[in-house]
Amino acid sequence: MDHETQMDDVLSDSDDDEDQQTARPYNELIQLLQVNTEPKGPARKRRKVEYNGGEKRDFVPAANGEEVDAALQGDDDLQEQEPSDEEEEDHPEEADGNHGSDDEEDANDPFETHFSAIDENKLALKIKSAEEKKWKNAKKEISSGLKLVRAIPDVGEGDVSLLPAMKHFSSVKLKKKLCGPATERIPEISGDAQHIAPYIFNYQDVLYGARTTSNSSAMRDILAVHAVNHILKTRDRVLKNNSRIAKEQDADLDLRDQGFTRPKVLYLLPTRQACVRAVESITRFFQPEQQENKKRFLDSFSAADDKSWENKPEDFRELFGGNDDDMFRLGLKFTRKTMKYFSQFYNSDIILASPLGLRTIMDQADVKKRDHDFLSSVELVIVDHADALLMQNWDHVGYILDRLNLQPKEAHGCDFSRVRTWYLDNHARFVRQMIVSASFITPEINSLFSTHMQNFAGKVKVTPVYVGAISEVPLPVSVKQTFSRFDSLTPTKDPDARFKHFTTTVLSSLVRNITSSRDKSSAGGTLIFIPSYLDFVRVRNYFATSSQTTNVSFGAISEYSEVREMTRARTHFMNGRHAVLLYTERLHHFRRYQLRGVKRIVMYGVPENPLFWGEIVGFLGLDPAGVVDAAEGGVRALFSKWDALKLERIVGTKRVGNMLREKGGDTFTFV
């Protein structure tokens, strides 16, 4: 790869600009990019791509769809992924094509006001407020059962107002190419989407915590319209300016219309099948005449649902149905008539990946191969089903988001005279839009709102008003549901406080009932549900070594248990050989077992997913003959003030405040 030639091109192209622009960030960036310009390998065939203002280099890591291929694919395979000589190129004359480039530029278009026509003085003030965490808020509960919190950087300008609902695309500044497909597919924006769409299309950050299986498809389509609209407008602007530069070569033009690298949209998704659904939505609205590598994409990403899962919950089938592999990455490139799958990242417009799949190429063992420059110019981030990503490995999500919009280490064929000023000033993270959808909001997901959502245009958080999972228990008889609050000074001390309360208060009475019972059949059947794996290990070790539990037979299964081990433990528990069964939330998330033999339930902590409450409590009714006795055994759950978010989902929005603040007692019972 001829890095020196590219660097010479970049530096020579930017000499004239440097004489005119002496901004410190620009000079520092040029100095930074002069480092490490030695060739790292043999020169390869390169092709002209009139998109980012110059010649673009090949990207070393493959953006392929196969986990095995990702590890084995060499330079030749990467070269083969490049467009063939016959493939349609990006030429300036495309600006006169059918991409809707005849659309008149509208000064009121959010694309213009957010990315191009920015008042730099106002932008600087808003960035300063965002950096100092000075936000002005407005809250509102709307009739559809949603709570909205909107925040904007506090620069002393008026009050914060909520945007009116959007019911049609008529008020959205869409490319003409998109208007027909969008209005045909979505004639009316309804449900939660009508309240969220105004913020999406006005380029504000969105944290949506009410994702369901019934509304996920509509939200996915709206996000696809937004993503494709952004790609087309970005691409059209660049091609128009390319044409203008070619026609006015003697003019001193200052056309800043792009970032450092080509990728503009990043999707983070939990599974390959989720990627297929997102791509299908994108294709539905872009409507390409040709789709290159589509068969390869479907063969490696899509699969049929498992017919044996017909009795599994609907949300489980949505998440794990089809191809549930969580190791993937995919680049999509758009030309006038074609959409190409498996394009190299530096030649892609949209990148879709799982957190694990993306991190494997960003954080390689060989330091020289580590690369995240392709994320330097991402302007739209879509994180779908964030709660599912939380159950995978949230550290990967944080790793990726921490490396978004950093200034690149290499030039990658960038024409710096075309780069927007706020990129050069290292302010891209304040202009980037982030949209996160989740079935529920946890502290980890909530931290995205405060840490990574720094949009100068503002941000909005949308959460449901919860009735409470305790009121939707699927049992034919009422069951006693008791919540015990324990004191915990800080989140870091919470695990120790919880363990102490469990072993001294809950376990002592539990052991006494088990060991003193004359009827062995009634002595067993205690399920201990533990949300955290670390807590699970601690409790399991205590049961195995403590003198307190010497006479208590128990089984313990987690997401790391082997299938044979899980089958044996479940059988022993059902038959009464194990009086106690320890069971983790992540195991339930991945398996959704129906545990038989449950007569009483102890929740070491309430589940993050409110659906799990009804499913776990429902175990009490799996044996119709003993359902009345099981209902008497009931449920006991431990909580502290640090469990506020998930406790609200279990007991309901109206009840949670009193339970956290009540000074008259620490035990609450619902029947």
From Swiss-Prot:
Gene3D superfamilies: P-loop containing nucleotide triphosphate hydrolases. Residues 1-110 are annotated as: Disordered. Residues 10-20, 66-93 have a biased composition (Acidic residues). It is found in: Nucleus, Nucleolus. Keywords: Nucleus, Ribonucleoprotein, Ribosome biogenesis, rRNA processing. GO terms for cellular component: nucleolus; small-subunit processome. Its main location: nucleus. InterPro entries: P-loop_NTPase (IPR027417), UTP25 (IPR010678), UTP25_C (IPR053939), UTP25_NTPase-like (IPR053940). Component of the ribosomal small subunit (SSU) processome composed of at least 40 protein subunits and snoRNA U3. This is U3 small nucleolar RNA-associated protein 25. It comes from Aspergillus fumigatus (strain ATCC MYA-4609 / CBS 101355 / FGSC A1100 / Af293). The lineage of its organism: Eukaryota, Fungi, Dikarya, Ascomycota, Pezizomycotina.
